[in-house]
Design a protein with these regions (language model features):
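Alpha-helical assembly-interface signal, strongest on the long, hydrophobic N-terminal helix that forms
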Residues: 1-69
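Short, conserved structural patches
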Residues: 54, 58-140
Length: 140
């Protein structure tokens, strides 16, 4: 039995398969974009925690962490429509020779509007939290 006798032509097969392949490719691209954006947010949180751990007080640590997070996200071209940065810097107020760490938490609303396909949301919320140790013997 030849292909013509089965009743399906190449154009009909392509018309059925092509939309599925395009949708799969779109999902693959959006998944990759989300994964890369999450890596950038993780890196920004680590940069913020490191910058905060080098400061002498809680207020300076919060400011340094926010500046470092924003700079890292701008450098990686990760656009956050909404950015929240939380800093836990109580370890900076601990007495000399006390071990501790500074923790930075980030919540970023990233846009996926340039990958506009059905079933793909227009944005995604990315969360990350990182810690950095405070040097227990540094001057306070």
């Amino acid at each position: 039995m030849s292909r013509g006798e089965r009743g399906l032509s190449a154009s009909v097969e392509a018309a059925i398969i092509l939309p599925v392949l395009v949708l799969f490719l779109g999902l693959l691209i959006s998944s990759a974009r989300i994964s890369i954006a999450q890596q950038h947010v993780d890196s920004a949180a680590a940069s913020g925690a490191r910058a905060a751990s080098l400061e002498r007080g809680s207020r300076a640590a919060e400011s340094a962490a926010r500046d470092a997070v924003e700079a890292a996200l701008v450098a990686s071209d990760t656009g956050c429509s909404t950015l929240q940065v939380g800093v836990e810097a109580a370890a900076l107020e601990a007495p000399l020779a006390s071990a501790g760490s500074v923790r930075v938490e980030i919540t970023c609303e990233a846009s996926l509007s340039d990958v506009a396909l059905p079933l793909i949301p227009g944005g995604v919320t990315l969360n990350s939290a990182r810690s950095s140790p405070v040097d227990p013997l540094r001057g306070r």
